[in-house]
């Protein structure tokens, strides 16, 4: 039933006409999906909120612009929510989806705010198997990922392009599990990227991700149980804005 929905159905769920579609959709992986999306929307020009009660599917999002590019942003937490938004936007006709958010470091030597633009994400998210056959990578579009890396470099932000691991269960990450992921070479862990990549790939859309390092799971520094305060918080707010602007500019190339 829902798999057979067409573009007109997805547009109706978004309460948009085809001519109103954004050039790029940003999916923000974050705990507080509403306030998080609101915060990032403030980095856009003229961002307008689509109230869920005006949309048949109840899908909240903001639409604004940056440097002449029309951008939509939705907050999502975990693979199922990311997949729902990615499927709806891509199904409506959007051609570019970029995952933003944070990752936990699985390798030593990273710093708060370091950025990873992953080549692919390990499919342990719980959703991607519904979109891609076993053995098919949930990977970024190489040209888009490379453009993001270049744009970030122009802003003085260095990046890693190593693969990450997408998990469905953040609080189940024991020290033993973390050590195993690290031994297998994963650069970091998040919850949404594999799902977003899988959906976008299956629906023929360009996709990439740019994630900021929040907690170091090796040294156990900057634990999410403690939160960020003071200068660290101020730094991360500026970094997230710069990364968001860079990925939009890269998508427009």
Specify the residue positions occupied by each region the protein language model found:
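Metabolite-binding pocket within alpha/beta catalytic cores that recognizes anionic/polar moieties
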Residues: 1-146
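Glycine-rich beta-alpha junction loops
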Residues: 30, 104, 165-170, 195, ...
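Generic non-transmembrane alpha-helical segments
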Residues: 43, 147-155, 199, 246-253
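Short, basic, glycine/proline-bearing loop/turn elements
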Residues: 67-75, 179-184, 232
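His/Asp/Glu-rich mid-to-C-terminal helical/loop segments that flank catalytic regions of hydrolases
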Residues: 219-253
């Amino acid at each position: 039933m829902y798999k057979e929905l067409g573009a007109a159905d997805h547009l109706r769920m978004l309460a948009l006409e085809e001519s109103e579609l954004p050039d790029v959709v940003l999916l923000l992986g974050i705990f507080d999906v509403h306030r998080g999306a609101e915060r990032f929307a403030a980095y856009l020009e003229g961002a307008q909120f689509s109230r869920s009660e005006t949309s048949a599917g109840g899908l909240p999002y903001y639409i604004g612009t940056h440097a002449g590019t029309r951008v939509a942003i939705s907050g999502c937490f975990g693979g199922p929510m990311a997949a729902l938004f990615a499927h709806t936007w891509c199904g409506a006709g959007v051609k570019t989806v970029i995952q933003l958010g944070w990752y936990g470091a699985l390798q030593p030597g990273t710093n708060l705010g370091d950025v990873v633009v992953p080549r692919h994400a390990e499919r342990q998210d719980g959703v991607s198997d519904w979109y891609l056959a076993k053995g098919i990578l949930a990977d970024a579009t190489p040209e888009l990922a490379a453009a993001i890396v270049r744009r970030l470099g122009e802003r003085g932000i260095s990046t890693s392009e190593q693969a990450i691991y997408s998990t469905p269960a953040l609080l189940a990450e024991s020290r033993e599990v973390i050590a195993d992921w690290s031994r297998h070479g994963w650069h970091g862990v998040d919850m949404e990227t594999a799902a977003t990549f899988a959906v976008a790939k299956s629906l023929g859309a360009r996709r990439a991700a740019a994630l900021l390092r929040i907690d170091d799971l090796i040294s156990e520094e900057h634990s999410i149980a403690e939160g960020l305060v003071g200068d660290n918080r101020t730094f991360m707010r500026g970094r997230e804005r710069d990364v968001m602007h860079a990925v939009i500019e890269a998508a427009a190339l």
